[in-house]
Curated annotation (Swiss-Prot):
Any one GO CC term of the record: plasma membrane
Membrane topology summary: Single-pass membrane protein
Subcellular location field: Cell inner membrane
Name this polypeptide is given: Inner membrane protein YhdU
Upper taxonomic lineage: Bacteria, Pseudomonadati, Pseudomonadota, Gammaproteobacteria, Enterobacterales
Length: 59
């Protein structure tokens, strides 16, 4: 049976690897800027840009 459907196994592995790489690429594009947690805010779970926090610390 494996001899008959080897191409299907190869295709499934290829699709799995392609999907994994695609999701990693999308995640990399979506998070261009570094995100940090502002522990001094009302909602510390909300992610904000780290540059904004650094700017507030300087003032």
């Amino acid at each position: 049976m494996i001899r008959k459907y080897w191409w299907l196994v190869v295709f499934a592995v290829f699709v799995f690897l392609f999907d994994t790489l695609l999701m990693q690429w999308i995640e990399l594009l979506a998070t261009e800027t570094d995100k940090c947690r502002n522990m001094n805010s009302v909602n510390p779970l909300k992610l904000v840009n780290c540059d904004e926090l650094n700017f507030q610390d300087r003032m």
